[in-house]
């Protein structure tokens, strides 16, 4: 056994009672747990460390049945599984593959316009279809996640991603643009099975001191795919006039992504499991105990929309992520506008934005695990995103590409670094509601604003230039920063973990006092 603070590495099959683990003051659980009369723990009942009471007996609200058929074998044991990093890395990789396919057309927008003989708006829709399909499919897929679990959703998403990649190989003629649209639509459906999973994987597989880092790693893959999507297509597909030669270069890109998608599907089948044997945190253990097999899915959504803090986060997250989607889709067009013939550098600027954002995401995830300052960190990152966007807006047309690289990278560090922050903040604000539902609603907001911003900014750029188009985004980022300031730091998951620890310590103290009293009486009697 390897002690990891509040968790233990699962190195053998011998369970370790929760009472044997160290208390972590940074760990958190839903505030209603301590005040609900049927949830509070009776301090007069002593629980021996070697036979910890089942959490369903300690924290079972009335009317909720413990899902013994779906939860881990013993909820009184808190352990993390060694498989957890393999699971999150495989997920991160196939998420990367899917996001690459999202941006591979937009990063060389002008080349695909020439090859297929279509308008820039038609190529933009190959990106926006990802956003459009997500909106109606999110709630059904979130329901499937609750009904069938992580493994089924992972297999479905990876399989659809692989299928879409191979369908695109049938579109290597200029008149076959509809085929590439079909392939992209299949990949966009796969994305619905991917985007809502990072926070769920982090909660189900990782300990309380690892969840933010794990969520950042899961989101990291999506951002890496976008980065590669900016870098690789301009290199593999040069801007040439001969369409036959262009088809050859496009086929190389499509074959590579098809092979990678197939390999990742095989890895998902081998590596991805539904859940670890034991819950990795006290909050997750209690979440199993609080879960009802008859819980209303629509009721959960209704409760989320009654949570004002979460509603504000949904709006602000959508504004930030939507601005990122619009910038990513239109970046090639904006750079070529001021720097003709610089398709490769346009891709490199996109790469710089995303790589900087990946660094920001990892740093923010580590910082959250240590500080738990969700509201403060989110607000600071949002304000810096606005500052970065303003600087980028007024330096894009200066005629110096190296300046654009610096300002775009600074903006990306905060803009894409914000994305995992939003997921984790949402889980804190909505615990013990499903992470899949909360993160899914965030993503719906992002897709809606992404479509609106992409179409609007594209029209503004075509009619008035890049600066007015970017100022348009700055206005909405200002609104998002202002609304973020009104979100209260109601960290329910943190409170729940803390209260569970306090109740446990109180139990042990009562047990200790109870065991000492008979001894004292016996000595007096003698």
UniProtKB/Swiss-Prot annotation:
CDD domains documented for this protein: MFS_FLVCR2 (cd17456)
Topological type in the membrane: Multi-pass membrane protein
Keyword Transport: yes
Residues where choline binds: 98, 102, 191, 195, 325, 447
GO molecular function: choline transmembrane transporter activity; ethanolamine transmembrane transporter activity; heme binding; heme transmembrane transporter activity
Post-translational modification Phosphoserine, affected residues: 515
SUPFAM superfamilies (UniProt xref): MFS general substrate transporter
Function: Choline uniporter that specifically mediates choline uptake at the blood-brain-barrier. Responsible for the majority of choline uptake across the blood-brain-barrier from the circulation into the brain. Choline, a nutrient critical for brain development, is a precursor of phosphatidylcholine, as well as betaine. Also mediates transport of ethanolamine. Choline and ethanolamine transport is not coupled with proton transport and is exclusively driven by the choline gradient across the plasma membrane. However, the presence of an inwardly directed proton gradient enhances choline uptake.
Sequence similarity: Belongs to the major facilitator superfamily. Feline leukemia virus subgroup C receptor (TC 2.A.1.28.1) family.
Protein name (record): Choline/ethanolamine transporter FLVCR2
Record lineage: Eukaryota, Metazoa, Chordata, Craniata, Vertebrata
């Amino acid at each position: 056994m390897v002690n990891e603070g509040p968790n233990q590495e699962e190195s053998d099959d011998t369970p370790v009672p929760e009472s044997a683990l160290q208390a972590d003051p940074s760990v958190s659980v839903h505030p209603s747990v301590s005040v609900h009369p049927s949830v509070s723990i009776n301090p007069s009942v002593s629980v021996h460390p070697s036979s910890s009471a089942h959490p369903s007996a300690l924290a079972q609200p009335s009317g909720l049945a413990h899902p013994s058929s779906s939860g881990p074998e013993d909820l009184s044991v808190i352990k993390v599984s060694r498989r957890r990093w393999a699971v999150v890395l495989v997920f991160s990789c196939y998420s990367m593959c899917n996001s690459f396919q999202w941006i591979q057309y937009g990063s060389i927008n002008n080349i695909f316009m020439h090859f297929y003989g279509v308008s820039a708006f038609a190529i933009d829709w190959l990106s926006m279809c990802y956003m459009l399909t997500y909106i109606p499919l999110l709630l059904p897929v979130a329901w499937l996640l609750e009904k069938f679990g992580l493994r089924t959703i992972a297999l479905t998403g990876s399989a659809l991603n692989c299928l879409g990649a191979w369908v695109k190989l049938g579109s290597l003629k200029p008149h076959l643009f509809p085929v590439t649209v079909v392939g992209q639509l299949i990949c966009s459906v796969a994305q619905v099975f991917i985007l809502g999973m990072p926070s769920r994987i982090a909660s189900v597989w990782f300990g309380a001191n690892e969840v933010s880092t794990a969520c950042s790693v899961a989101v990291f893959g999506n951002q890496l795919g976008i980065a590669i999507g900016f870098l690789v297509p301009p290199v593999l597909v040069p801007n040439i006039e001969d369409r036959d030669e262009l088809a050859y270069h496009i086929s190389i890109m499509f074959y590579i992504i098809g092979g990678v998608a197939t390999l990742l599907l095989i890895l998902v089948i081998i590596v991805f499991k539904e859940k670890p044997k034991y819950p990795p945190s006290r909050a997750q253990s209690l979440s199993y105990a609080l879960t009802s097999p008859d819980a209303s899915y629509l009721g959960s959504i209704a409760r989320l929309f009654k949570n004002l803090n979460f509603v504000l986060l949904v709006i602000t997250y959508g504004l930030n992520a939507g601005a990122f989607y619009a910038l990513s889709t239109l970046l090639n067009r904006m750079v070529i506008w001021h720097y003709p013939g610089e398709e490769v550098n346009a891709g490199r600027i996109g790469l710089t934005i995303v790589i900087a954002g990946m660094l920001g995401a990892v740093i923010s995830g580590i910082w959250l695990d240590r500080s738990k300052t969700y509201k403060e960190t989110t607000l600071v990152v949002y304000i810096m995103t606005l500052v970065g966007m303003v600087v980028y807006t007024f330096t894009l047309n200066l005629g110096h590409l190296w300046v654009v690289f610096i300002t775009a990278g600074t903006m990306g560090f905060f803009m894409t670094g914000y994305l995992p922050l939003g997921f984790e903040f949402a889980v804190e604000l909505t615990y013990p509601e499903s992470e899949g539902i909360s993160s899914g609603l965030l993503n719906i907001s992002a897709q809606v604003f992404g479509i609106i911003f992409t179409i609007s900014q594209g029209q503004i750029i075509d009619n008035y230039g890049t600066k007015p188009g970017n100022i348009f985004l700055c206005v909405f980022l200002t609104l998002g920063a202002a609304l973020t300031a009104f979100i209260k730091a109601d960290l329910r998951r943190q409170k729940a973990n803390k209260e569970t620890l306090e109740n446990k310590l109180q139990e042990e103290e009562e047990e200790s006092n109870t065991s000492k009293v008979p001894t004292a009486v016996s000595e007096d009697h003698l």
